[in-house]
Amino acid sequence: KLTDMYGKIKEHLQHELAEIEAAGLYKRERIIASPQRAEIEVAGRKVLNFCANNYLGLSDNPRLIEAAKKAMDARGYGMSSVRFICGCQDIHKELEKAIADYFGTEDTILYAACFDANGGVFEPLFSEEDAIISDSLNHASIIDGVRLCKAVRYRYANADMGELEECLKKAQAQRFRIIVTDGVFSMDGNAAPLDRICALAEKYDALVMVDECHSAGVLGETGRGITELYDLRGQVDILTGTLGKAFGGAVGGFTTGRREIIDMLRQRSRPYLFSNSLPPAVVGAGIETFKMLAESHELHDRLVANVEHFRAGMMAAGFDIKPTQSAICAVMLYDAKLSQEFAAKLQDEGVFVTGFYYPVVPKGQARIRVQVSAGHTIEQLDRCIAAFTKVGKELNVIK
């Protein structure tokens, strides 16, 4: 029997859902009937995939699949426990060391997702005596993590070093100060000016934390992220990241950095303490991922070449492209309805992308976000550019 209270909330939710639908903001899941790769099957037809975070093309890599199978055969399907009770195998420690070696840090702690890593990093380390200074375009997980903490909060406009400096001046009375930024911002694809952030952190005596989710595997000479890009390896106090993007695309997050910080997170970070350990298959494939990346940076080099090829082709066609160094290419359309229509027509042309508009991006800043992968061939990139060009002319976006 339904309670009266459920009847009330049901009516309320139905009304809110109808409003979301009417505003064109209702999110529908698009069903993929193939492995995640450069070409996927959607609604019974093959399309080129340009909206996955599969930056190094590893989501269906045979070596990772085999490593996952071997780990599951040797260590089982699941852990059925949190780490500090009976959920820690030798391979969990091996993966944590591999991540620390990759980023040049002292220690690493694994989480179920990077949302948990960001959500669980602030509360154990900072109190009302401290200050967190956060970029305005940081990921939702950072925003939620900061909300869970009692520290004084400051926010500066995206990559605005003048505003950041003003925040640091205001925060001088606090005991501890930390600057928090995404390495690459997911909607524009721009990289944080980490060299200038670290210079200000040194000037005003602050810690620095970077979310490497969209920069690890992508930026830097060998793909080791934004700290490598700016020659700051080992100089950033806290890095967070994911195994769900460049590093195989499955699940799992991590925090890596100073040893004492990681040790305190093991003691008091609630998402770590109260969530099951990562399953052996994911851990085994993760270890294999970092072995592959230690052997060669061929995949990173291919990604860089693909990004350069795609951006050059799109700009030659006349599209308005946000300047970035990342694998995220924001094709600016500015109008919300146009971005939806453009994305739908591209899917008709066999190109799978997503249009983004308010409230995901600011009003008047609608765009199609293209994510390039090392798994794309030059022929696939050219097909995508040709489809964009055809639709762009049909909709009077380009001449």
Functional labels for PLM-detected ranges:
Residues 301-310, 315-350, 360, 364-365, ...:
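Conserved PLP-binding catalytic core of the aspartate aminotransferase-like
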Residues 2, 7, 62, 66-70, ...:
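PLP-dependent enzyme catalytic core of the Aspartate aminotransferase-like
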Residues 204-207, 214, 219-325, 338:
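Active-site C-terminal subdomain of aminotransferase-like
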Residues 11-15, 19-77, 206:
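N-terminal "arm"/small-domain region of PLP-dependent enzymes with the aminotransferase-like
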Residues 82-88, 97-120:
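Short loop-beta-helix segment that forms the pyridoxal 5′-phosphate
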Residues 154, 158-210:
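Active-site phosphate-binding strand-loop segment of PLP-dependent enzymes
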